[in-house]
Amino acid sequence: MASEITNGKNGQNGKNGQKEESDSQIAPPIPYPKSVAFIISNEFCERFNYYGMRTILVLYLTNKLGYNEETATVLFHTFTMLVYIFPLIGALIADGWLGKYKTILYLSLVYSLGAMVVSFGAVPLSGMPTKAVTVVGLLLIAIGTGGIKPCVSAFGGDQFSLPAQSFQLAKFFSLFYFAINAGSLISTTFTPILRADVHCFGDQDCFSLAFGVPAILMIFSVIIFMAGKRLYRCQPPAGNMIFGVSRCIADAFKGWQKRRHSEPMESFLDYAKPTVGSRMVQETKCLGRILRLFLPFPVFWALFDQQGSRWTFQATRMDGNVLGFQIKPDQMQVVNPLLILGFLPLFDYIIYPALARCGIRRPLQKLTLGLLLAALGFFLSAGLEMKMEQAAYRATPIEPDMTHLRIYNGMPCRYEISSAVVQTPRVIEPLNVWEDLSLQMTESKEYTFNAQPVSGECPSIIDKLRLQPGKSVSYFLAQDKLVEFADGLQMAATDTGRTSVRALLNTPDGEGPVLLSTESATSQEPPLTLDKGNVPQLHRITPGFARVDINGKKVASFEAKEGRLYSILVTGSARDGYQHNVIEVVALSTVSILWQLPQIVVMTAAEVMFSVTGLEFSYSQSPPSMKSVLQACWLLSVAIGNMLVVVIAEFKFTSSQSGEFTLFASLMLVDMMIFLWLARSYQYKDQREDFEDDDDATIDSVMQSKPKATTVDTTARKTNGIEAEPGYGAYRNHAYDNDFSEA
């Protein structure tokens, strides 16, 4: 029998012998469910696999599969969109057929298979359709991870007895999110190292290993999940509530058509009560009120998920050298989970209580702040991109009617050049370059070119310059001819943290081999053979110290910095000796990669305010029978957000990346105002309402028989002294009630 305690004023009123006491019973404390440990561990391993694979995916698409940045961005967000579409299917399977446990188990096996297929596809085997294998693997991963997403967090919530453990449930979601970001932190730290610092199959990187290690962790996650089977509280499937909701809406429409004049009702859905019952109608109304709030959410996810695509590509154009240590572009993604691990306790114990003192403690208020912070993060990224674009004009024309022209002098003589496109005759020093990056041109033209030696015994060169609007073209004076080649500077400068070198050799035929070798603090690459006749060829090297050897003799050496394109001009012969000059043609990576930190910090704070709060809000406010479905709808908003990125990337609404970032930030501000308008009248549902006795209707009756109608009290009431009011209701974060309770 439960012990009894006095509540209120205890003791006796001495002289009068009167005493006031009110007795109430309390149940013994419910122990924290041990099964949660297996769920948290499983989530850690699964997230390690997902984020490890996702971290390097865009670089794999560009570096190995040959896609450009735009196409890689579209593919990345299409994959992410599928990842968040399949939760709806997973929820249907869990709620209507297998239950959460079996759904998680079976789809995790599909997930593991997909991870292994992607890893196998990264092995450079002759004749293997790498792109097709990768697509199949990514599709299996999308089915697996998407299918289990709505089930795992809800399955964890099922382990708690509510409302008695509502406080522990709130802390579980923080712990659950902690596990997600711990797995993400470790995988985003080490997966780029496996990719870049390990050499395999004759390549300078090892994507197969970088994909393979996370795949092994995914297999471990399945084993861990199965190990806790005996401890799980497995709720039986509550019925396929998608069809239940659809039936409710369809019956309401039929009833409205027949009885709207003779029997007007307050709500459209009330017309379905005779067929599906009062409780089903009320839960459908509750679902509709929550989904109405979800409408603006996709824009947030459109911004958030670009950390893995656009922000990673932005990092490739930045200088990763920090105190002698080279930060890889994809490693910047590690900052987000690292900050999450610190931000969760910071927000729980400092920021949220501080906001509560200012009257900001409701979930919808926190969600609004999260939207605002996301907009701020993208305004910061737009500002950073503008700074980088100031140097980008050297790589490629920034206007469609602009042309870049460079003329390299590979001769040991000074040359005076003249042409109709050159306003006045110019002198080019030996082994140097003349350039004009602001030529205005509306159509393709040919111009006569004349190069006369000013000093030394060199021949005159007369040829043609062929220029096109919006293009960058270079010419090389060598021996007695003018060699034309396309620059390819933009691609070189954005090649994921590597450096590009072009060799312009004015040496006798037959002298060689000409070798380019590089050495960094962590590795030494095998020498590359330079082909004198292949002038346009760009050689990708790792930043470090580079040298050029001809016939085993060192000709040139220089420090190759990240994100640069160098032209090495060499003239002479083995008999007379060689002369050289190293020209840094493009230096896009002059902005430190650490300048990405402010936008990452702001976006991480937005994630904590929005995602953690939204996860708890969705679970606590959803009807008991629809929790997995509502979780799937939450994740479906992520899919729509990624589809928005695909649309904007494909239609190219702006001509610059900074303009695109500004567009997303502006959309976020408009989206936030829409959310404020939608949330202004939302009334929170107390979790304890889910556990009040309801003898008149059950969810089972929706599928099986016609229930009795019930009357639902929608007037304001008090719950534990907390009065419901518009936009607040009886819901509050109970963790702060002791300190900030209202009168």
Curated annotation (Swiss-Prot):
Span list, region Disordered: 1-28
Gene Ontology CC terms: apical plasma membrane; phagocytic vesicle membrane; plasma membrane
Annotated localization: Membrane
Descriptive protein name: Peptide transporter family 1
SUPFAM superfamilies in UniProt: MFS general substrate transporter (SSF103473)
Tissue expression summary: Expressed in thorax and abdomen of females: apical epithelial membranes of midgut, rectum, and reproductive tract. Also expressed in neuropil of the central nervous system, with elevated expression within the alpha- and beta-lobes of the mushroom bodies.
Family: Belongs to the major facilitator superfamily. Proton-dependent oligopeptide transporter (POT/PTR) (TC 2.A.17) family.
GO biological process, one term: protein transport
Its membrane topology: Multi-pass membrane protein
GO terms for MF: dipeptide transmembrane transporter activity; oligopeptide transmembrane transporter activity; proton-dependent oligopeptide secondary active transmembrane transporter activity
Organism of this sequence: Drosophila melanogaster (Fruit fly)
pH dependence: Optimum pH is 6.
Record gene name: yin
Main location per the UniProt record: membrane
Keywords annotated in UniProt: Membrane, Peptide transport, Protein transport, Transmembrane, Transmembrane helix, Transport
Gene3D superfamilies: MFS general substrate transporter like domains
Compositionally biased tracts (Low complexity): 7-16
Protein role: Important role in absorption of dietary peptides. High-affinity transporter of alanylalanine. Dipeptide transport activity is proton dependent.
Coiled-coil boundaries: none
Regions that span the bilayer: 74-94, 104-124, 132-152, 173-193, 207-227, 334-354, 364-384, 597-619, 629-649, 659-679
Taxonomic classification: Eukaryota, Metazoa, Ecdysozoa, Arthropoda, Hexapoda
